[in-house]
């Protein structure tokens, strides 16, 4: 089953506010404008109260692409049949004037419709004689009229194509619908616009959303920009999004991650006799897990929230330790053993952290309470301080492979920028023992290029417009949105490809 998708909350709140509202959705071909329009009907809970006019795509094509639409929304394509009606509750002064001009042979291209004086008022109804030149708009008006006083959502995909079909400028059609539907009858209207960039039509709608497809590090990046929403506060105007699974999902940077009560880690088993799991199944699928005797590098931007880094190392440490194996850890940001214990011990049985984890700290940070788990870094000889035989001696009951999880921002702050050049003994020992080495670096780190040169797998994590993205440099992958699910009581990575 495809993912449910998600429209930015500001757009949903905009349409849910009292009164009528209009929104222009624009962007180049392939950016998801039709998907956005159709999905909006579902997220507003108004699928049955929506009228979709497709001027470019046949109903059959829509149903093939959006299977969930069938039996829920009946699109209306361009029509040739003529319809009439005896009375209408929906305001239609501007439409009647436009039809009148068409019947007189005029183009109907004035920017603003003139007031009309024809028609007869009967109670709360305005009865006028209909023209028969605009059957698609007539059908939309009749749909809305049949549901008054309830609100409906009318979607026109696209207003450019409808204008071409009629020989009427799109601006004129928007003005007519704005006056009749939005202002006169308090209905919601969405116009799909095929052009991108700033246009004079932007001034005619209450809101404007643009969709764009660009590149980030040679990978596809999709960006949704809320250019305006009249009367609606916009806290975050730009979202990354994906069309994965045929749905538009905007990644919410303000997403409320609610941790459940901490639970014991459920170990992810080895992928093979030569590869342990990272504890992060989506990453295992990309890189094939942690190959024994080899190096994995994570290049993590300083713009990435610290929680994301902590959940990443929590998953790796817990998955190794929960299987009775050993961990030697240099925390990022010159972190302490005490903080590492607080981070991961709630996901382990009592005593397992002390038995299977050793944390390297700068000598000045050593605490007596953590003397059993702390290994000191004196700051002069990194190969001696991180000597692998000492780690093995400290973890006599732990099974193999061990995990060496080392943050190079801390190592560089203790030993200097050339620290990695002095760690040949550590890398050689890990390789001989068939253990696994994971290094964290930042893009600015002097060790980044050298570590990535040693690594068989390189992941890069960054923050783009407030959303955290991940991609593989080795092996080469597309761009993913990275989020975390804590509902199970421990951190679980969720990757969504940006396609």
Each PLM stretch: what is its role?
Residues 20, 46-49, 186-187, 203-207, ...:
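Short glycine-/polar-rich loops that comprise or flank the Walker A/P-loop
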Residues 294-299, 331, 351-429, 439-440, ...:
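Extended amphipathic alpha-helical coiled-coil/heptad-repeat regions
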Residues 206-281, 459-499:
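Phosphate-binding and hydrolysis-coupling loops of NTP-dependent motor/remodeling domains
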Residues 126-203, 208, 377-454:
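P-loop NTPase motor core
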Residues 49-162, 325-413:
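Conserved inter-motif catalytic segment of the P-loop NTP-binding fold
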Residues 23-25, 51-53, 190, 207-211, ...:
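Hydrophobic/aromatic beta-strand patches that form the interior of the parallel beta-sheet core
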Residues 31, 56-60, 160-161, 195-198, ...:
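Conserved nucleotide-binding/hydrolysis micro-motifs of P-loop NTPases
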């Amino acid at each position: 089953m495809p993912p449910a998708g998600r429209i930015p909350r500001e757009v949903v709140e905009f349409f849910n506010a009292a009164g009528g509202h209009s929104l222009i959705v624009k962007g180049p071909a392939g950016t998801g404008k039709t998907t956005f329009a159709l999905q909006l009907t579902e997220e507003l809970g108004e699928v049955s109260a929506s009228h979709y006019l497709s001027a470019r795509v046949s109903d059959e094509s829509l149903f093939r692409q959006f299977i969930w639409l069938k039996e829920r929304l009946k699109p209306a394509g361009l029509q040739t049949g003529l319809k009439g009606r005896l009375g209408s509750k929906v305001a239609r002064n501007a439409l009647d004037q436009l039809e009148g001009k068409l019947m007189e042979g005029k183009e109907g291209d004035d920017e603003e419709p003139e007031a009309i004086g024809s028609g007869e008022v009967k109670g709360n109804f305005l009865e006028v004689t209909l023209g028969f030149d605009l059957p698609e708009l007539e059908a939309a008006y009749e749909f809305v009229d049949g549901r008054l006083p309830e609100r409906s959502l009318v979607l026109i995909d696209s207003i450019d194509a409808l204008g071409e079909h009629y020989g009427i400028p799109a601006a004129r059609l928007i003005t007519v619908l704005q006056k009749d539907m939005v202002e006169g009858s308090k209905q919601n209207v969405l116009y799909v616009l095929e052009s991108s960039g700033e246009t004079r039509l932007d001034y005619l709608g209450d809101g404007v959303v643009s969709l764009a497809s660009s590149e980030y590090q040679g990978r596809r990046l999709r960006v949704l920009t809320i250019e305006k929403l009249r009367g609606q506060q916009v806290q975050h105007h730009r979202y990354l999004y994906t069309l994965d699974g045929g749905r538009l999902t905007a990644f919410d940077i303000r997403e409320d991650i609610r941790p459940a009560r901490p639970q014991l880690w459920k170990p992810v088993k080895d992928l093979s006799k030569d590869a342990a799991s990272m504890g992060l199944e989506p990453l295992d699928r990309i890189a094939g897990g942690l190959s024994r005797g080899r190096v994995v590098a994570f290049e993590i931007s300083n713009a990435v929230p610290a929680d994301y880094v902590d959940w990443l190392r929590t998953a790796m440490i817990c998955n190794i330790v929960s299987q009775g194996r050993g961990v030697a850890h240099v925390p990022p940001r010159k972190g302490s053993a005490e903080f590492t214990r607080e981070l991961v011990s709630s996901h382990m049985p009592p005593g397992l952290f002390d038995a299977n984890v050793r944390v390297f700290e700068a000598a000045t940070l050593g605490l007596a309470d953590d003397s059993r788990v702390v290994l000191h870094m004196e700051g002069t000889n990194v190969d001696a301080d991180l000597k692998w035989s000492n780690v093995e001696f400290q973890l006599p009951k732990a099974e193999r492979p061990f995990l060496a999880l080392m943050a190079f921002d801390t190592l560089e702050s203790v030993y200097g920028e050339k620290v990695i050049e002095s760690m040949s003994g550590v890398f050689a020992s890990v390789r001989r023992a068939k253990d696994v080495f994971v290094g964290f670096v930042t893009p600015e780190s002097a060790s980044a290029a050298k570590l990535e040169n040693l690594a068989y797998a390189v992941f890069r994590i960054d923050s783009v417009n407030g959303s955290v993205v991940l991609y593989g440099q080795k092996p080469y992958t597309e761009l993913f949105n990275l989020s975390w699910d804590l509902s199970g009581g421990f951190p679980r990575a969720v990757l969504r490809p940006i396609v």
